[in-house]
Amino acid sequence: MTSDQQSEDSAACKTFTGSGATCAAAWNAAAQTMNGQPFYGLMDLAVLPAGCNWPLAEEIAQLLQSTARPAPEIAVFVLDPAVQMPIQDQTPTLYENLKALEEKQQLHCGLQTLFDNAETAAVPVSAGGKYAMLFYDTAGNTARQTQSPLAAQLAAILCGQAHRLDCTLPDDLYLAAKAAADVQVLAPGSVRVNLTLRDVELKDLTPATRPDAELQVAFAAAANREFDGLITALYGINGPDADPLDLCFWLQNRYGSTQGALRAELTLHWHRPGEG
């Protein structure tokens, strides 16, 4: 999808499609249908196909990196599997929805981040106004996807792709949470992840009004369960083959190596107004 620089309506856009044996051939075929010379310097969003495996994701990302600049400004998503194909008629709405999601959640997966780690890559998957996180194992050509909004947002924060929590917790907790989030990782022997929450809004979804302290306890318990689940899913029980959340990095810096299963714990800090 491109903006039409010749249109008096600045919101106007056009969709061009092409097919080919490779991503580059398809891109070139689409470009040939345009009137005028395409300019890629203002590209700000790339959407990978639903179910995209790592070789295809890598091929698309490398093509974008060699064609469009500046690459770090291009946000990357994996397409929501629920989006009906073909998407030509839905493209403007899809673009608007993804940009709105990016702004609301303060989420940004830059194109360059797909190449920051040789063993793994993390990309958000749009999911009906929410997102999941998809972790590619680039060596094994496998992928794992988070299963809950809270797990996805914790993973995105740990990856440095997000700085905000905004989700409804599982049904049995009847709780919604919003907060700005900062993360600090320490490695005194095991990995300790300090998550500081600022401007916190905890909303009780039950008819009763539970005190804030009770809501904080419920949220902390849910966050720790999801964090433990992430560590188990992404690092396994026999020691990590990759470091998708960059947690082993801190242990390696301090001790030179990591041995055995990763031991990590999450600690929440509630920032109150007026505190530094």
Q: Which residue ranges define each predicted feature?
A:
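Membrane-proximal alpha-helical signals and transmembrane carboxylates
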Residues: 1-276
